Amino acid sequence: MEAFKNKVWLSSPTMHGEELKYMTEAYETNWMSTVGANINEVERITAEKISCKYAVALSAGTAALHLCMKLAGIKPGDKVFCTDMTFDATVNPVVYEGGVPVFIDTEYDTWNMDPIALEKAFEIYPEVKVVVVAHLYGTPGKIDEIRAICQRHDAIIIEDAAESLGASYKGVQTGTFGHYNACLLYTSPS
């Protein structure tokens, strides 16, 4: 088989305006990573867009989800309910903290976590105190039902909105429904 002559990019870089200026500024001021004026501005604009009080820019969506797991207090051996149809970065941080993912089936309407399956899972594992909800392919899950179930069981919601930046549920931007939320500014997490 002959090798491809050209690369096929998932998302080729596009420059439409002042991107090169901002990249050069970051390079010249030696603020290429996690701090600096450009990062502060990204955080401000993101918080404004999502309608939340604060946003913290990290290196990747996985890092954001890992921070969420730490903030939620997951300890070794803790079971954590997770959406079963998602990118592995949704679940890997649970394992990084020593937690045990328990996968919750998806439902037909949105392909996201099934509230009925979540309720049944709480019957089997009433000790679970963290639920990781992901919105697949830009489609929000059934947040009202999931929040009500989690509230009844005193469970923290970690919202993985990596695939749903710009999507809303009942007029509210995803990335604001959990106790801890992670969004992504990349074209696709998978």
Predicted regions and their residues:
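Conserved small/polar residues in nucleotide/adenosyl-binding loops
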Residues: 186-190
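Short beta-strand segments
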Residues: 59, 132-134, 182-184
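PLP-dependent aminotransferase-like
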Residues: 70-152, 156-161, 168
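Phosphate-binding glycine-rich loop
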Residues: 35-79, 93-95, 103
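N-terminal "arm"/small-domain region of PLP-dependent enzymes with the aminotransferase-like
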Residues: 1-32
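Active-site nucleotide-sugar/metal-binding loop of Leloir-type enzymes
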Residues: 176
